[in-house]
Amino acid sequence: MQELKSLSAYRQGLKGKILDTAMTLFARNGIKAVKMDDIARTLNISKRTIYELYENKEVILFEGIKRYNQRREEEMSQFVKGNTNVMDIILNVYKVKVEEFRFTNSLFYDDLEKYPDVMAYLEKSRDENRKELIAFLNKGVKEGYFREDINNDLVTILFDSIGQLFLQKRLYARFSIESVLNNIMFISLRGICTIKGIEVLDNFLKSQAE
């Protein structure tokens, strides 16, 4: 029985390693360019071992993105527990996104469109995030960082549209993530902020420019 438990733990650990390795390769080279052989070679395991755990590359991509999102959600939950306000959360997300995109090849985003199941999952995630964003906006109003006269539904649609614009217009291939966030996201965010919120944004952007 103990041997079976050990084997099961090993397989679960290996599954996670395969996903993490594959996602690193996908981000570095684009999804299409990465073959199962590349993943196996990087991990120093046989391709057969990978196929015993995952049916194909699309399944690895799908599960890898899910795993990545779950980790990000857990990290954000831990960050939020530190009695942070909405502006702290926004600026933390900014730093995470900048770091994330800095190590991601633009081909990765181009290739995503070729995987409908993955795109459907991402769309579902966006729908769930919209509900969380409304609660976030209400929190910002209570804390005095966001204006009381904003329409939460319209603001949510606006920020969701910005995210889709980033992918559909391939802004990631033409501009740095800092430029996109500073010129589109932060300008839109500034419009819903109170003087208190604007001061936090301006101080942050000033510190980034120094």
Feature names for model-found ranges:
Residues M1-N29, A33-I45, V59-F62:
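Basic, helix-initiating cap at the start of DNA-binding domains
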Residues D127-V155, F159-F166, R170:
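Hydrophobic alpha-helical bundle segments that form small-molecule/ligand-binding pockets
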